[in-house]
């Protein structure tokens, strides 16, 4: 019996082992097939998912706009409260202490302290609670329409105070006003703790003021950059063409100045009678037969372009004109020198004196402390001083502003023998006549003395 049981048990174990082996092989095959199928499915799903991601990339990249306030439930009850109701702070008053409350439930809770009967509203399960939305009472407000109504009573109150109410709360530090007390308290906590510094050095405690100031500074910097010339462009402009153009401008300026002194027709809206009256008084020795007494190509004013240094800048700086005292000293030196023959001495004397007087008159008319102040400005001031209502209208150099300010003795000496700093046109001409007569008389006397010595 025992041997039969052992044999049966041994056979059962062998059968069980064979079944396990067969199950393992079948399971491995099924698993392999399942894994291969899963691989193909996962690869296919990955491809589809990648394709779907590529399709949805443009949609995710778009920025979502923020919803504007006031998007109520279409089924909500629209409440339109009056401005008086919205601005009321104490709608519910306590009968004992006359303390006001905004809500009835706050009043009921307050009554407990007075040992008064109080009652809170109880909601029953049968009552259907309908949501309420509130519109702004102002007709021109965007929240006046029911589609833009606000869903909170506190929110509509604050909106009405901020946009349409009076700003009662003022910050003591920055003087900014608020209509809502909570906004004022929130601002007071951070006011003065943070500073906004501009590049120009100005400090601001408020961000909005800083932004406004910064925009103004940026605009001013752009305008200044446009107005200031570029140094590289200035250096590049030092070309022969530029100097030729500048020389032509200077020649035109000198020729126009000579035409004003020598001709009776002025370049400007002046009357013909006034121009003839002024130039009839010019002495003949000033407008001599020799149009070029000082050798400057027929111009009373020497060309500015001749003294331009091409290595520095394209804008020539005019050399300071000689003062009247220096010219008189030069005249004394020229008068002290003697020529070899009387004829040459007489010619050189007359030429020197004519050159001196012409240069002196030019210096009196063109020796202000500031460059660019010439005969046209002197004549314009003199013309306005004598009642003439018309002035030059850009006859000399177009684009330049006329300087009507007279220097109070800060520059070099302009007058002769202690006269005032600016003489009228008639006084200059009379002085020139007297000076010319004196010079001619002295030259004649000197010539007579030389003839007497030779005899």
Swiss-Prot record:
Amino-acid positions noted as binding Zn(2+) 1 in the UniProt annotation, renumbered to this chain: 171, 174, 187, 191
Positions where Phosphoserine occurs in the chain: 82
Keyword Transcription regulation: yes
InterPro entries cross-referenced by the UniProt entry: C2CH-3rd_BIRD-IDD (IPR055187), C2CH-4th_BIRD-IDD (IPR055185), C2H2-2nd_BIRD-IDD (IPR055186), IDD1-16 (IPR031140), Znf_C2H2_sf (IPR036236), Znf_C2H2_type (IPR013087)
Disordered: annotated span: 1-52, 235-351
Compositionally biased tracts (Polar residues): 17-49
Keywords: DNA-binding, Metal-binding, Nucleus, Phosphoprotein, Repeat, Transcription, Transcription regulation, Zinc, Zinc-finger
Keyword Repeat (UniProt): yes
Zn finger spans (CCHC-type): 196-219
Compositionally biased region (Low complexity): 248-265, 288-299
Main location: nucleus
Region of interest (SHR-binding), residue spans: 206-218
Localization terms from the record: Nucleus
Record's function text: Probable transcription factor.
Protein's name according to its UniProt entry: Protein indeterminate-domain 7
Annotated organism of origin: Arabidopsis thaliana (Mouse-ear cress)
Organism lineage: Eukaryota, Viridiplantae, Streptophyta, Embryophyta, Tracheophyta
């Amino acid at each position: 019996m025992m041997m039969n049981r052992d044999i049966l048990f041994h056979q059962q174990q062998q059968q069980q082992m064979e079944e396990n082996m067969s199950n393992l092989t079948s399971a491995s095959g099924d698993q392999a097939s399942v894994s291969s199928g899963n691989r193909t499915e996962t690869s296919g799903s990955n491809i589809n998912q990648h394709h779907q991601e590529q399709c949805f990339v443009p949609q995710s990249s778009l920025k979502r706009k923020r919803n504007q306030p006031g998007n109520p439930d279409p089924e909500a009850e629209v409440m339109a409260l009056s401005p008086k109701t919205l601005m009321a702070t104490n709608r519910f008053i306590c009968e004992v202490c006359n303390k006001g409350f905004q809500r009835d439930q706050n009043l009921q809770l307050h009554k407990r302290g007075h040992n008064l009967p109080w009652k809170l509203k109880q909601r029953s399960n049968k009552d259907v609670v309908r949501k309420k939305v509130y519109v702004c009472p102002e007709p021109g407000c965007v929240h006046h329409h029911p589609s833009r109504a606000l869903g909170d009573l506190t929110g509509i109150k604050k909106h009405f105070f901020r946009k349409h109410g009076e700003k009662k709360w003022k910050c003591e530090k920055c003087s900014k006003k608020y209509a809502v007390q909570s906004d004022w308290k929130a601002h007071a906590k951070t006011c003065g703790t943070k500073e906004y510094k501009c590049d120009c050095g100005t400090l601001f405690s408020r961000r909005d003021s800083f932004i406004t100031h910064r925009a103004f500074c940026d605009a001013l910097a752009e305008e200044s950059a446009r107005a200031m010339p570029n140094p590289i462009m200035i250096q590049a402009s030092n070309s022969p063409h530029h100097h030729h153009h500048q020389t032509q401008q200077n020649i035109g300026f000198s020729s126009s100045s000579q035409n004003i002194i020598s001709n009776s027709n002025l370049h400007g809206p002046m009357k013909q009678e006034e121009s003839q009256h002024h130039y009839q008084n010019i002495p003949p020795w000033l407008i001599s037969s020799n149009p070029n007494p000082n050798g400057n190509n027929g111009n009373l004013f020497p060309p500015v372009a001749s003294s331009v240094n091409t290595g520095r800048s394209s804008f020539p700086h005019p050399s300071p004109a000689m003062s009247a005292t220096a010219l008189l000293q030069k005249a004394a030196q020229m008068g002290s020198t003697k020529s070899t023959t009387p004829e040459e001495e007489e010619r050189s004397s007359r030429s020197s004196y004519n050159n001196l007087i012409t240069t002196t008159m030019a210096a009196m008319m063109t020796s202000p402390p500031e460059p660019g102040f010439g005969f046209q400005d002197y004549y314009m001031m003199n013309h306005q001083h004598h009642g003439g209502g018309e002035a030059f209208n850009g006859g000399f150099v177009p684009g330049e502003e006329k300087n009507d300010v007279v220097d109070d003795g800060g520059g070099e000496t302009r007058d002769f023998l202690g006269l005032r700093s600016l003489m009228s046109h008639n006084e200059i001409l009379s002085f020139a006549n007297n000076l010319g007569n004196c010079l001619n008389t002295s030259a004649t006397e000197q010539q007579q003395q030389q003839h007497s010595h030779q005899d």
